[in-house]
A protein has these predicted regions:
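Substrate-binding surface in catalytic domains of secreted glycosidases
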Residues: 238, 245-281, 297-307, 339, ...
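Substrate-binding cleft and catalytic face of glycoside hydrolase catalytic domains
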Residues: 66-262, 273
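Aromatic/acidic polysaccharide-binding cleft in carbohydrate-active enzymes
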Residues: 289-408, 431
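N-terminal signal peptide c-region/cleavage motif recognized by signal peptidases
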Residues: 12-14
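Carbohydrate-binding surface patches
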Residues: 382-439, 443, 483-490
Length: 501
């Protein structure tokens, strides 16, 4: 097994950064189940991009590192996929050729679709209102809800015919994307979206009641209470709720307040808000999916291309544990064109993998965090996760959070073990010198179009170094963490038991 610490370029000392700390790791501490909710699903560029080999290669790379199960993308109903058409008399016709290639490609690589039902086919739209993405999706309601229901039903029936109900019943169907902002121009926004959802749920469930449907897929954690109430009061099917949040969303938009909420806290504060709304609703316990989240919705190389993502991700897992069934990082790849075709490999794209198949520090962070166990042990620290694998070995994440692009303070953590029979561990590090491709990219002059030789060099430079063997002496182990540092410690159990001191 390989592991690493992420050392960042620099970072501002924040409330999460700390100088020195002793952490007691007690194998007999209270614990709870720790499902890997953060790596079950990833977002990606729109539907048609899934046909590219570069997309599929990146998918295979991330699948190998995380074993993720679902992928979500926009625009399966966009005209470029070609599913919907009408003849001169207005009679609908359907063509599932590209859709089949899209879903065949996902399933062949061991990933199921989380189907976002969007956007509106031009010939079905009530108005030709385009959102400003490069591919200009139509974001108006349908002009004829009977035809919309027909499209949804024909689509679902075709999927079942091709893949079988036992397969498709394991997928999820989400109605639209972020209807509370500029992806929906129905009036009023909430009421017209609820109408869309009602018709969609009706059509889908009439094909087969085992198909799973949910929403509202809102930005900024919006509408959850009202949406559940609408479904309950009108007996509308609801198998899960979904929404989105980004760490730089404003408190005004997410909470309706002027409270200052740090980037490190925003995502999981929103997760707690939604969790509490669901538990207080008519559908307590309904699964909660964050079908988009990230540290930023801007393109910022100091965030999504930088080691900053390691501590931010680790701390997000710590804070969001128990608040959601699944979170979908936006996105797994920079095969992505919402703002246009990328002009260089590192522009602050959302993806874990840059153009040319170059893994970023965020990819390495996910790869490292995949090593965590499936039980979480209680620990008195805001900078650590202590987990246990099914066979009993302990895996610990440690981090030193600092705000992106500014300087922070190095720290040292001392682990003191109790009820742990171990004299050695493996320590994995990722920093500006190890596993961060940024330095090599700058060294070669930041080429806009790296040559094939340069791409090979960049991919090599992005690799995590082998885990270092470290000794546990007198039940103690010290780990140095720079600002933006993330470490994974895998404790190696002794063959014979030792008495803790």
């Amino acid at each position: 097994m390989k592991m690493a610490i992420i050392f960042a370029f620099a970072g501002l000392l924040s409330s999460l950064a700390w100088s020195d700390e002793e952490i007691i790791v007690d194998a007999e501490a209270p614990h709870h189940a720790f499902p890997h909710f953060w790596e079950q699903m990833f977002g990606s560029g729109r539907a048609i991009l899934t046909l590219r080999e570069s997309y599929r290669q990146d998918l295979r790379t991330v699948k190998k590192a995380t074993d993720f199960k679902f992928v979500r993308f926009h625009a399966i109903f966009h005209d470029e996929v070609g599913i919907y058409d009408e003849d001169k008399r207005g009679a609908p016709s359907y063509n599932f050729s590209y859709a089949d290639q899209i879903y065949d490609g996902l399933l062949a690589n061991g990933v199921r679709p989380y189907v976002e039902l969007s956007f509106m086919p031009r010939k079905l739209a009530s108005r030709e209102v385009e959102q400003n993405f490069k591919y200009h999706p139509i974001v108006a309601p349908p002009r004829d809800y009977a035809k919309w229901e027909g499209l949804v039903a024909a689509f679902a029936a075709h999927l079942i015919e091709r893949y079988g109900i036992e397969e498709v019943a394991q997928w999820y169907f989400e109605v639209w994307n972020e209807p509370n902002i500029d992806f929906w121009v129905g009036v009023p926004a909430q009421g017209s979206y609820f109408t869309l959802y009602d018709h969609t749920a009706k059509a889908l469930k009439q094909v087969n009641s085992r198909l799973r449907i949910g929403g509202p897929a809102t930005a900024q954690a919006a509408w959850i209470g009202a949406f559940i109430r609408h479904c309950a009061e009108n007996a509308v099917p609801l198998d899960f709720v979904s929404t989105h949040v980004y760490a730089n969303d404003t408190p005004e938009n997410v909470f309706g307040s002027h409270e200052k909420i740090p980037r490190a806290e925003m995502v999981c504060r929103a997760a707690k808000k939604v969790h509490d709304e669901v538990e207080a609703s008519a559908r307590p316990g309904v699964p909660i999916f964050w079908s988009e989240y990230n540290a930023t919705y801007f393109n910022d190389p100091n965030i999504t291309d930088a080691p900053f993502m390691g501590p931010w991700l680790a701390d997000t897992l710590r804070r969001c544990d128990g608040l959601t069934e699944m979170m979908s990082y936006w996105t797994f790849s920079d095969v992505f064109e919402e703002q246009g075709v990328g002009k260089r490999p590192f522009y602050g794209g959302f993806g874990l993998i840059a153009a040319g198949g170059i893994p970023k520090p965020a990819f390495n962070a996910f790869k490292m965090l995949h090593a965590l166990g499936t039980e979480r042990l209680n620990v008195e620290s805001e900078h650590a996760l202590v987990t246990r694998r099914p066979e009993g070995s302990l895996v610990i994440a440690l981090w030193n959070y600092a705000e992106p692009g500014l300087s922070g303070t190095p720290s040292t953590v001392s682990l003191r073990f109790r009820h742990v029979a171990a004299s050695s561990a493996r320590l994995l590090r990722l920093d500006a010198d190890h596993g961060d491709v940024g330095r090599e990219y700058l060294r070669m002059g930041a080429p806009t179009y790296p040559t094939r030789t340069q791409l090979a060099q960049l991919i090599k430079a992005s690799e995590l170094p082998p885990a270092a063997a470290v000794a546990i002496v007198n039940n103690r182990l010290s780990v140095a963490l720079p600002p933006h540092g993330l470490a994974i410690v895998e404790v190696l159990r002794d063959a014979a038991p030792r008495h803790p001191k």
